[in-house]
């Protein structure tokens, strides 16, 4: 099974991403519902510009983050660690991403928050269902 295909299949079944941003030595993390685009290897999220993490990100920033489930047993642990870049989308790019996001999360139609893209440049997927400590690694 191809590494990116396996990772993408799992990410498509999840819906919450955690990412951390750094600015002038200060770190901050945030969570959001996401839409995963397997073709672009990117998450799309909504977050207000006034939030601390958006203020620290500015229009574009390097980030790191995770997506994980909450299994009750070690043998079922699966999760992704990643590094990449977050940027606020504008214009047609934003409109297309928002339409796709709203299809996944219809309640988001009521939100006016800007759309952001988290482009994944490196992914490490831990999947204990394939054997304890099994890691799949992908890089752009």
From Swiss-Prot:
Record InterPro entries: Split_barrel_FMN-bd (IPR012349), UPF0306 (IPR011194)
Similarity comment: family membership: Belongs to the UPF0306 family.
Protein name in UniProt: UPF0306 protein YhbP
Organism for this UniProt entry: Escherichia coli O127:H6 (strain E2348/69 / EPEC)
Organism placement in taxonomy: Bacteria, Pseudomonadati, Pseudomonadota, Gammaproteobacteria, Enterobacterales
Gene: yhbP
